[in-house]
């Protein structure tokens, strides 16, 4: 796993993935609290 992707840094991928996961969890809990998540 020592080979880097070259164009895209690994920390950038981790940061974007983390923000996306946190955003999806936030939207899911917000929908659950507002009653929109009950249909999922």
Curated annotation (Swiss-Prot):
Species the sequence originates in: Oryza sativa subsp. japonica
Assembly with partners or alone: PSII is composed of 1 copy each of membrane proteins PsbA, PsbB, PsbC, PsbD, PsbE, PsbF, PsbH, PsbI, PsbJ, PsbK, PsbL, PsbM, PsbT, PsbX, PsbY, PsbZ, Psb30/Ycf12, at least 3 peripheral proteins of the oxygen-evolving complex and a large number of cofactors. It forms dimeric complexes.
A GO biological-process term: photosynthesis
TM region positions: 8-28
GO cellular component: chloroplast thylakoid membrane; photosystem II; photosystem II reaction center; plastid
NCBIfam families: PRK02565.1 (NF002722)
Key words of the record: Chloroplast, Membrane, Photosynthesis, Photosystem II, Plastid, Reaction center, Thylakoid, Transmembrane, Transmembrane helix
Top-rank lineage group of the source organism: Eukaryota
Function: One of the components of the core complex of photosystem II (PSII). PSII is a light-driven water:plastoquinone oxidoreductase that uses light energy to abstract electrons from H(2)O, generating O(2) and a proton gradient subsequently used for ATP formation. It consists of a core antenna complex that captures photons, and an electron transfer chain that converts photonic excitation into a charge separation.
Major subcellular location class: plastid
Compartments, as annotated in UniProt: Plastid, Chloroplast thylakoid membrane
Membrane topology classification: Single-pass membrane protein
Family: Belongs to the PsbJ family.
Gene3D superfamilies in the record: 6.10.250.2070
Protein name: Photosystem II reaction center protein J
Classification via InterPro entries: PSII_PsbJ, PSII_PsbJ_sf
């Amino acid at each position: 796993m020592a080979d880097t992707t070259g164009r895209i840094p690994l920390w950038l991928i981790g940061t974007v993935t983390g923000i996306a996961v946190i955003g999806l969890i936030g939207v899911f809990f917000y929908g659950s609290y507002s009653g929109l998540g009950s249909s999922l």
